[in-house]
């Protein structure tokens, strides 16, 4: 694999030399076998400078030669004999000075020497473009821009690209490093470990914007196992032509031959990010894109003009009339981009590695795309790479984005979970590495540390690290980055067999438990065994789903619980009967269910509150718990977990007399409300009980693990109040959402501080008093700016909600 040093430095800003970088890459396991110099013009035009022809006289002994004096930036001009018919005094020309090495068309070198031509000394050569490798013309010398200064290096004038290219002997398991970005990611980890503070720079795709939606091509993936993720977008109005010099130089440096600007961009992104892409001529696509297999024996002609016979398991990219491309391996002749192409469908996908490997082997094909798909690419950058390529195509080929990104991604590809035991690290490596160092190394490799204990770490491994799925793999990563040279080898070597402890994700649970403890909650741990009769208390629980014990100790302990509610109500009842009626309880626990296809376990977090909010005190008047108190606790937990993209929905469970559900992407995260009196009566409870049930399994899947913080604003915030007369059916949430949509940038907070329903109001109306906090983080707001925002909010409320000011 070839890696350009200049390209690498786009992702890692460093002043390290190529030698230092090469050594570190080798230490990290990315063995640099050769470092080659690359120059966009062979020889780099070293020794060639701009010359100013001062005089040009006919050679005294040769009709076709001229004797010139040329200023090449030295103290004295030099004499050069030239045979070109177009040389003349006053010109600025390229001059190859004494000792310069030039190359002919076949690549053979020749050196410029001082000599005599027909008795006249010549101290260099005025060059034609073919002599410099800038073209094929030999009609005459090159005449340069008159504004150039004598002595200016030609490499500067002609913008010769100089680079150093690492030839890396990449092992098959390191699919994550098969790109410049992946190599830079490893390099960052190694540099951080060596005390060099660097950041990994990711190219931005923030300016990806659809110009018009005039060419949408739908996608149908018939086998999501073979194509777990597929994205596409259309670009119209492009011009297929030669790529700009910078793009050609990038590709040439790593040994690729530029084709045209569209193909070159797909190759560029492939080697930049490791994501294979394919561009189809959109005009040649009939109907929609269909990803499927075709019958055994189907004929298909690929880009190399070879007719191939397809296997029934070959995954194909087709349209409604037939095949277009062998998925992840090779394009088809009829659908490829040509000089006449004006619109394209750009594909970015994640294909099954085993399927691609078998297809490539069957057809004897080994392409850059199949090479990466076979080893496993990063499933999380499919859309990002598509946007990156689309932006580059717009830059080098013009055109407009004419569709939204079409994506088929039915089931998210999950990351790997590994539990790392510190003692096992020591046993394998033979030397104790500080725990903080281990954590820093793992974080630098984009491995998330989910939980920390004295004995080890709970880790989440990115899906693109297909080679790191076990504890021993993690230890290898630690050792690789820590440095083999930093390990002291003893004379005696010990070998042990490591155990695999179960994976735990207690860190998040402990954080939330601590938060609830600080809010006055007590943690409870109820028995998972309960009575089968509880399933009859709710229609949402089914008796046929009960997991029953074969030999229970009693009928009250005969069934694995389907809900945490009833064991919680048992605890509430127990405490009330002992004169402890002000309660805040929580429990992390599992529920158990039997279905036709087997058994399932689901982890939940339950909250129960009942009685008074606080203990009786002369400073705090007695106030009972209510739904809004519970809602505050729930929202606080979600905020602590960094879950903010939530919405409310009607509660589905029939255990509540009143309640609501909080959803994330249409999946229910939490159900909460007041428990029905009929259920409370079964437990002998006469006071209201509020209950919240968190789907903890789902929460663990969606939390990001890191919460971003921002500095305290330097500029003051401003509060403005509105008293709105609204319909009884209007909710605070609808006002909140509408306000946020109306003023996204400067509206920081909204608070409902008074509700009035009663006399002097029209029938069916109520009054809400709301405060609006407005702030600009970059400057102090003026009264006119604030008034404009408040006027916009007022008009929106009047238009959308029929509200009026009181």
Residue spans for each PLM region:
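Extended, well-folded interaction surfaces typified by the phenylalanyl-tRNA synthetase beta subunit core
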Residues: 418-581, 720, 773-777, 785-806
């Amino acid at each position: 694999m070839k890696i350009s040093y200049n390209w690498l430095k786009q992702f890692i800003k460093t002043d390290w030399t190529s030698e230092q970088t090469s050594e570190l890459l080798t230490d990290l396991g990315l063995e640099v076998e050769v470092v080659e110099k690359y120059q966009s013009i062979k020889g780099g035009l070293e020794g060639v400078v701009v010359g100013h022809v001062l005089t040009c006289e006919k050679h005294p002994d040769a009709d076709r030669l001229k004797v010139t004096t040329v200023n090449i930036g030295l103290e004295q001009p030099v004499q050069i004999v030239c045979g070109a018919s177009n040389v003349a005094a006053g010109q600025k020309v390229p001059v190859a000075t004494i000792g310069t090495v030039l190359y002919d068309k076949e690549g053979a070198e020749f050196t410029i020497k001082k000599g005599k031509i027909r008795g006249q000394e010549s101290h260099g050569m005025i060059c034609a473009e073919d002599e410099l490798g800038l073209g094929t013309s030999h009609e005459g010398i090159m005449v340069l821009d008159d504004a150039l200064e004598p002595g200016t290096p030609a490499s500067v004038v002609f913008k010769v690209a100089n680079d150093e290219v690492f030839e890396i002997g990449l092992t098959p398991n390191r699919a994550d490093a098969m790109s410049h970005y992946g190599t830079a990611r490893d390099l960052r980890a190694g540099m951080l470990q060596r005390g060099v503070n660097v950041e990994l720079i990711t190219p931005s795709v923030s300016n990806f914007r659809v110009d018009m939606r005039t060419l949408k091509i739908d996608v149908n993936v018939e086998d999501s196992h073979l194509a777990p993720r597929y994205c596409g977008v259309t670009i119209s109005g492009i011009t297929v032509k030669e790529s700009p010099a910078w793009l050609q130089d990038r590709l040439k440096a790593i040994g690729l031959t530029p084709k045209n600007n569209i193909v070159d961009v797909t190759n560029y992104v492939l080697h930049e990010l490791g994501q294979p892409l394919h561009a189809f001529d959109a005009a040649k696509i009939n109907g929609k894109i269909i990803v499927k297999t075709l019958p055994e024996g189907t004929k298909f002609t690929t880009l190399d003009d070879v007719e191939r016979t397809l296997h029934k398991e070959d995954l194909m990219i087709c349209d409604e009339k037939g095949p277009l491309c062998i998925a992840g391996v090779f394009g088809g002749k009829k659908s490829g981009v040509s000089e006449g192409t004006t619109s394209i469908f750009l594909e970015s996908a994640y294909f099954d590695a085993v399927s691609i490997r078998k297809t490539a082997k069957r057809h004897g094909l080994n392409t850059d795309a199949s090479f990466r798909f076979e080893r496993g690419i990063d499933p999380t950058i499919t859309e990002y790479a598509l946007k990156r390529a689309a932006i580059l195509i717009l830059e080098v080929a013009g055109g407009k984005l004419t569709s939204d990104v079409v994506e088929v991604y039915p089931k998210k590809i999950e990351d790997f979970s590994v539990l790392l035991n510190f003692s096992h690290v020591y046993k394998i490596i033979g030397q104790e590495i500080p725990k903080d160092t281990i954590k820093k190394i793992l974080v630098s490799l984009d491995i998330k540390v989910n939980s920390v204990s004295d004995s080890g770490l709970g880790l989440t491994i990115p899906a693109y690290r297909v080679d790191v799925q076990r504890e021993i793999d993690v230890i290898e990563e630690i050792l690789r980055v820590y440095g083999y040279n930093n390990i002291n080898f003893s004379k005696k070597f010990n070998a042990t067999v490591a155990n695999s402890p179960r994976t735990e994700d207690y860190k998040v649970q402990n954080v939330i438990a601590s938060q609830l403890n600080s809010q006055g909650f007590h943690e409870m741990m109820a028995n998972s065994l309960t009575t089968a009769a509880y399933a009859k208390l709710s229609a949402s629980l089914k008796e046929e789903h009960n997991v029953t014990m074969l030999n229970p100790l009693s009928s009250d302990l005969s069934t694995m619980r389907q809900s945490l509610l009833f064991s919680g109500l048992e605890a509430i009842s127990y405490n009330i009967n002992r004169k402890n009626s002000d309660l805040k309880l929580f429990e992390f626990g599992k529920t158990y269910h039997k279905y036709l296809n087997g058994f399932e376990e689901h982890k939940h977090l339950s909250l129960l509150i009942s009685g008074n909010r606080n203990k009786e005190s002369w400073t705090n008047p007695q106030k009972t718990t209510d739904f809004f108190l519970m809602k505050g606790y729930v929202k606080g937990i979600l905020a602590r977990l960094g879950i903010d993209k939530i919405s409310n929905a009607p509660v589905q469970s029939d255990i509540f007399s009143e309640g609501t559900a909080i959803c994330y992407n249409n999946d229910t995260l939490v159900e909460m409300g007041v428990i029905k009196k009929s259920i409370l009566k079964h437990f002998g409870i006469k006071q209201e009980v509020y209950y919240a049930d968190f789907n903890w399994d789902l929460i663990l899947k969606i939390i990001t693990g890191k919460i971003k913080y921002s500095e305290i604003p330097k500029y003051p915030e401003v509060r403005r109040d509105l008293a709105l007369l609204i319909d009884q059916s209007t909710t605070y949430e609808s006002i909140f959402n509408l306000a946020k949509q109306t003023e996204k940038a400067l509206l920081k907070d909204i608070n409902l501080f008074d509700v009035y329903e009663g006399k002097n109001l029209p029938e069916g109306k109520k009054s809400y008093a709301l405060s609006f906090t407005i702030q600009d983080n970059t400057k102090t707001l003026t009264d006119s700016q604030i008034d404009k925002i408040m006027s916009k909010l007022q008009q929106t409320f009047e238009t959308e909600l029929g509200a009026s000011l009181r």
